[in-house]
């Protein structure tokens, strides 16, 4: 009979062996880059060739031909290693990256009482097709009404797929295409759909995709509101543009293999604009599936708009930073949803709310804070509150960790009758309104500190919550949202990101009937519209505006459209003061707002644009520490000649400047501008310098004689003696102006790489 110790050892060895066996044989989705031109003539298609290199045909998920050269497959690590070593045609293999979603009044705030106020532009945007990669679409939304829309443009090569609870007949002359891509998601979920709520079709059961697509190009819907809030006409930026949706995001996120397949298809379908309100962490461009797909789109004249991320105000948190992508941060509107907490000590605290249920009456209720079963009760995490203490009371919950609306649900389930969600330092003074399941308001950090102190110091603290509906013409606005991700750009610090900010706080747009406005399973309410916040909301604003610019200037490249939006952006709010940051109410800077807040009226006629060709982007890539194979992965060419590479990535003809001294005292960049204004135009330069940097521009005057004429100028940046080499940043600007136009470029200065 074996001893107990030897039996234990045997069990440990067997358990370890089984763990290692499972670990080494566990399958994952891999993206495989292939030398496209190496396909043997014996294979009719690349699909056939790729399949021949796999042990099983069923392992192949997608074949990529446009946005990427290669395929994705479901393999274990041994198979992946074997595949990489089996052929010189296999250039790279990497795991499927996971991305996440970056989750009305807007047209008026942007000055779009009609599309740019140009009557002919509305009809001309009929030919623009905006592709939205997201959670799908709710086609029955009134925002997809196609009344008076002309026939679908002949360039459209896409289709409307049928699927679970989705008939292809649901598409029309407004919503012209709908597809879904789920192979990467299914493989990550064990080969199937893990959630009963998933719809194996383009149908949106999340709401996010319907919200973003209707923000970009929703038809005008009168008498729209969210439970009585934000009442008026809801419409997208480009109300007459067509929408094509590509469902790539599922319950566990958005997988790179699915995103690449959707971008591949969208480019071939004939979209003019791609809108992606999703992203992940930073990666080299040759491993960034969005950047790779976006390069192919740009090369074919497709404008790509991406959200900057919701990881602000953390420094260097910005996502989607490739220079051929428009990276969009978020700002506030001049609309608010005020709510108040009348305290028992006579003070009135101001906050916001979208609560629409039965009010609290006139009797104040007792306030409690941090009363629960765990140390996390201050955050109101699930199961953290003691119902015997919070029942019948208003609970103060700190913002953070779990979803804001979930906190309200936790309070309600514990028997609480109301909630005040108080910001901490992470969110500062930013106020985001939510449609809680019980009476609730959100307050900023300073107000929250007063509230927490009141609860702790008063023997019987009380409050009464009061809701005041919708208020317009709020000042100051816009303000940079605290959640909006910040620069500097960690992949290429010489490129300033984000590019611009747009409306991204408390945005009204269409919604899915499959889910309540909070997104919680226990929310039984159904609404046609919802109010959401995030750079997910600001991104489609710019996508729609890009569509309008494309309609007005069909000859403009994606880089020219991007330049027009950036150089005409404004940096003063509606009180004529510099933009502020909601995180701490301090002055904002280009790491937070990029070139500024978009101004579509001015973008229509920018005067000058900074255009960038595909060859210039390749010279930019050559200036990075990438191998030729890495660059080929992005540009999809048989070979790349880097003999004319830029000496510095900052030499790219970008509409903004990010100067990294990195031990040097002098940095010199040359830019080229193209005249898109009056034929005979003269521009003079104005420099707004930084305390530690001298700036000189030569020449100081640019004279144009014709439309399309190009002129160059050189900027010399000199770090003043005695400047300490720290992580500090300073900012300035360079503006070319004449009586009709101001073409402004922000400048960011840093001395050390982040």
From Swiss-Prot:
Q: Where is the major localization of this protein?
A: secreted
- List, from the UniProt record, the residues annotated as the active site of this protein: 134 (charge relay system), 208 (charge relay system), 536 (charge relay system)
- Which residues does the UniProt record annotate as the domain Peptidase S8? 98-604
Q: Which UniProt keywords apply?
A: Autocatalytic cleavage, Glycoprotein, Hydrolase, Protease, Secreted, Serine protease, Signal, Zymogen
> Which Pfam family, any one, appears in the UniProt record?
fn3_6
Which regions are flagged for Basic and acidic residues bias?
195-209
- Glycosylation (residues): 35, 223, 373, 641
Q: Which GO terms describe its cellular component?
A: extracellular region; Golgi apparatus; mitochondrion; plasmodesma
Matches recorded under Gene3D superfamilies:
2.60.40.2310, 3.50.30.30, Peptidase S8 propeptide/proteinase inhibitor I9, Peptidase S8/S53 domain
The residues covered by the Inhibitor I9 domain are: 29-102
Annotated signal sequence range = 1-26
**Recorded GO terms, molecular function?**
serine-type endopeptidase activity
* EC number of the protein: 3.4.21.-
Q: Which GO terms describe its biological process?
A: proteolysis
Family affiliation: Belongs to the peptidase S8 family.
Annotated PANTHER family: PROPROTEIN CONVERTASE SUBTILISIN/KEXIN
Annotated protein name in UniProt: Subtilisin-like protease SBT1.8
Name of the gene: SBT1.8
